[in-house]
Amino acid sequence: MRLAFLGTPDFAVQALAEIVEAGHEVACVYSQPPAPRGRGHELRPSPVHAYAESRGIPVRTPASMRDPAEIEAFRALGLDAAVVVAFGQILPREVLEAPRLGSFNVHASLLPRWRGAAPIQRAIMAGDAVTGVQVMRMTEGLDEGPVLSTATVRIDALETAATLHDRLAAAGAGLIVETLAQIAAGRAVETPQAEAGVTYAKKIRPKEARIDWTRPGPEVDRKIRGLSPFPGAWFELPTEKGPVRVKALLSAFEDAEGPAGETLDDRLLVGTGHGAVRLLRVQREGRGPQDAEAFLRGTAVPAGVKLS
């Protein structure tokens, strides 16, 4: 089929790659404009943009797909279908309906649970045991369209947003290729989403990232893993030179009791409002990520230290 692909982050690259490998004609890739990245804050193309250029696929990076000129250019592509994976813009009806067979989205949750921007993080933070990825027909409503296909994924006890991201990206890439084949053959079945059980995965705000040790231990643990590696749940560690910000990147709940926010041993077991959390991987401000053992070799944290 002749397709357009609209996507931006790493999550979308594997889907684009497998669509190309499956032999579909990708007429154009749309991605968010180049943004400052890295320590030098240089303008760099998105991961999807970079991949498309490496394969010689034309790329457009409009500031808004609502621009009448962009809508007309999209229509002029003469598409069979459009595939959208974490593009980063809400698409107008004129764009969604331009392809002959419609526009289809790969979404990283089991709809109608976790419609919105941050389904991977919210699923972990909420303690969901199972999530997944689905292909749906796009409508003007936010992630409200009928579902064509589903792949379920269990959330492991030490799952982080990074590990779940990679598993769902792989599942979604395979699923969209299978679903496009069904659409082309006229065999795709569309199932309306349930009206009950709707939840929204709001965008992660910076103020959410600070750890509140007074919350129950399981909740603190899920927050740490759900925000790892970005933006990273963080706390302040007192030092002789003043407080230092430390990100907690991996943790595990333990059935131990002690004052909330206080280290209960010399191996980064921290008391919470209920139970305790063992920090397994951390990142001190200005340094790279480290396993707890390596971190403690350079920064002693004895029992009784109050984290804030």
Curated annotation (Swiss-Prot):
The keyword Transferase applies. SUPFAM superfamilies: FMT C-terminal domain-like, Formyltransferase. Its EC number is 2.1.2.9. Keywords: Protein biosynthesis, Transferase. GO terms for cellular component: cytosol. (6S)-5,6,7,8-tetrahydrofolate binds at S109, L110, L111, P112. It catalyses: L-methionyl-tRNA(fMet) + (6R)-10-formyltetrahydrofolate = N-formyl-L-methionyl-tRNA(fMet) + (6S)-5,6,7,8-tetrahydrofolate + H(+). Belongs to the Fmt family. Attaches a formyl group to the free amino group of methionyl-tRNA(fMet). The formyl group appears to play a dual role in the initiator identity of N-formylmethionyl-tRNA by promoting its recognition by IF2 and preventing the misappropriation of this tRNA by the elongation apparatus. PANTHER family: METHIONYL-TRNA FORMYLTRANSFERASE, METHIONYL-TRNA FORMYLTRANSFERASE, MITOCHONDRIAL. This is Methionyl-tRNA formyltransferase. It comes from Phenylobacterium zucineum (strain HLK1). The gene is fmt.
